């Protein structure tokens, strides 16, 4: 299963190239390395214990990126819309996790702003992506932010809208009033009918999670004002997408499918930010949920925003001549953890030394205060990263060096009391480690972090060297021995028995002359023919 899923995801970048090549002229694109698939999955799994409001979600403004100025030559209107939607789905498959979309009412249907793309076609594209990635191996969170044009709140007619929604049953949502058909509330009906309730995390779901103590604050404590972890969102609730309205055109209540704009913090334009340089500043920023910045970015600036704890919404204007730059921009933002080209377990092996390139180190560069993750030999001896059990954003580096296998094992840990062997789970936590090293004037260094693929190659897990891969069943040698021993003993016993029977004659055959004499004696008592 893991191999099949990997093969599908490795085609993402090639598909992206083919989709654009079909739609645009003078286009060239090289596919990304397979390590990108492993890197994004490992990064998602590391963040699984973080609450969803603290995740770095890289997004795009659909109107500015795909609609404005995009004219596909030799295509009619319908073909152009179809190509744009294919590009959008490919971008989602490449790792984009947030979409900002303008919605307006035009020609008696709801459409994506400044386009002829029907809003339900946009939603069906999102649904296709959700269906295609709805496995534990590929699933991830998606945020869709809607801007409903203010002049679009009172259009339409019941008959027109009923035809447009393809038979949507309003009785499925109790708070809809049929007399209101044609206003902005219709958008919620479209979302319900085209996405499906099972994928959507709604305000009602949040209330339920808070009532059941499934939500946490930034300290990891149960909170009625918190959000669920990514793990709970994806694997317990089995949800995939949140919808939020950035305008105020729709009525809001806890039975709605959409969150209102008060749940998030969205800045636009050239916003000057400064990265937190202390634990108190990191804590203060963490108290702001869903931190988005919508702007035109460069490769360097978009990565800077992510490293400082923000989620960028890319609003660069593209056309058919420069749209290929978008992938480079998204790649710069998506991967806040790994070095480019990592993780790689294909290091050259030396038969004279013990080598196992399945463990990850935190590589710090002092001259620019940057860091990334890199796969190293598990037998190398390094210091390790230790996180305080109670204090937020509090990290230290161990005094002792050891191999990865022995750094934190059943025999004990090299981390001091009150600290656990750990790994940065978000960009802000990574920034906290960088600040710790910077304030101590640390030189370039490499330290072990709690991430490895020892059990299954390229399945990156936390929890020390004995952690197992959640996507593939792995049997240890000890369990395998316990399972195979009874069967082996039984088989050996049967083999011995069969061998003995083949080698030893039956007792009655030991004296063949006596056997023949007995047969002759019995034959005398037999009559020939029929007795008179």
Curated annotation (Swiss-Prot):
Any GO BP annotation: cellular response to hydrostatic pressure
Extracellular compartment spans: 24-487
Coarse class of the protein's main subcellular location: membrane
Spans traversing the lipid bilayer: 488-508
Annotated glycan sites: 26, 114, 151, 163, 169, 211, 253, 260, 322, 328, 368, 441, 479
Cytoplasmic side: 509-532
Membrane topology note: Single-pass type I membrane protein
Keywords: Glycoprotein, Membrane, Signal, Transmembrane, Transmembrane helix
Location relative to the cell: Membrane
InterPro entries (UniProt xref): Telomere_Capping_Maintenance
Signal peptide location: 1-23
GO cellular component: endoplasmic reticulum membrane
Record-linked Pfam families: TIM-barrel_MTC6
Function of the molecule: May be involved in telomere capping.
Family, similarity comment: Belongs to the MTC6 family.
Name of this protein: Maintenance of telomere capping protein 6
Species per Swiss-Prot/TrEMBL record: Vanderwaltozyma polyspora (strain ATCC 22028 / DSM 70294 / BCRC 21397 / CBS 2163 / NBRC 10782 / NRRL Y-8283 / UCD 57-17) (Kluyveromyces polysporus)
Gene giving rise to this polypeptide: MTC6
């Amino acid at each position: 299963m893991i191999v099949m899923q990997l093969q599908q995801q490795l085609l993402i970048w090639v598909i992206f190239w083919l989709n654009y090549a079909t739609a645009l002229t003078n286009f060239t694109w090289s596919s990304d390395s397979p390590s990108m698939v492993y890197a994004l999955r490992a990064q998602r799994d590391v963040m699984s214990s973080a609450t969803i409001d603290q995740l770095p979600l890289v997004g795009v403004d659909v109107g500015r990126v795909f609609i404005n100025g995009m004219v596909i030559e030799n295509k009619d209107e319908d073909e152009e819309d179809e190509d744009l939607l294919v590009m959008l789905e490919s971008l989602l498959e490449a790792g984009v996790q947030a979409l900002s979309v303008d919605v307006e009412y035009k020609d008696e249907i709801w459409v994506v702003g400044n386009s002829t793309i029907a809003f339900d076609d946009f939603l069906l594209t999102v649904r296709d992506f959700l269906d295609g990635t709805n496995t534990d191996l590929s699933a991830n969170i998606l945020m869709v932010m809607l801007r409903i044009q203010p002049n679009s709140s009172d259009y339409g007619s019941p008959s027109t809208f009923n035809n447009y929604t393809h038979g949507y049953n309003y009785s499925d949502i109790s708070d809809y009033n049929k007399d209101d058909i044609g206003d902005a509330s219709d958008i919620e009906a479209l979302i319900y009918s085209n996405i499906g309730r099972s994928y959507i995390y709604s305000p009602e779901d949040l209330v339920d999670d808070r009532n059941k103590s499934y939500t946490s604050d930034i300290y990891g404590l149960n909170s009625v004002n918190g959000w669920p972890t990514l793990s709970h969102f994806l694997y317990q609730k089995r949800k995939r997408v949140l919808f939020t309205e950035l305008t105020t055109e729709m009525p809001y209540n806890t039975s709605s499918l959409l969150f209102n704009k008060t749940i998030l913090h969205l800045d636009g334009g050239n916003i000057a930010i400064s990265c937190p340089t202390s634990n108190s500043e990191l804590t203060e920023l963490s108290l702001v949920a869903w931190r988005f910045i919508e702007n035109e970015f460069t490769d360097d600036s978009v990565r800077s925003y992510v490293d400082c704890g923000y989620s960028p919404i890319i609003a660069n204007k593209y056309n058919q001549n420069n749209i290929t730059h978008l992938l480079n921009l998204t790649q710069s933002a998506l991967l806040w953890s790994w070095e480019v080209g990592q993780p790689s377990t294909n290091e050259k092996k030396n038969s004279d030394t013990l080598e196992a390139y399945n463990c990850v180190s935190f590589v710090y560069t002092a001259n620019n205060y940057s860091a990334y993750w890199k796969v190293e030999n598990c037998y190398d001896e390094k210091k390790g990263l230790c996180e305080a059990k109670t204090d937020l954003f509090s990290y230290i580096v161990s005094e002792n060096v050891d191999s990865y296998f022995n750094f934190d094992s059943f025999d004990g840990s090299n981390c001091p009391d009150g600290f656990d062997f750990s790994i940065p789970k978000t960009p802000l936590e990574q920034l906290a480690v960088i600040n710790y090293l910077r304030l101590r004037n640390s030189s370039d260094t490499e330290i072990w972090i709690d991430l490895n693929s020892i059990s299954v190659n390229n399945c990156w897990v936390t929890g020390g060297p004995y952690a197992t891969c959640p996507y593939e069943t792995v049997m240890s040698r000890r369990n395998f021995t316990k399972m195979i021993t009874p069967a082996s003993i039984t088989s050996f016993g049967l083999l011995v028995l069969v061998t003995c029977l083949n080698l030893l004659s039956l007792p009655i055959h030991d004296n063949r002359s006596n056997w023949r004499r007995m047969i002759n004696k019995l034959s005398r008592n037999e009559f020939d023919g029929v007795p008179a």
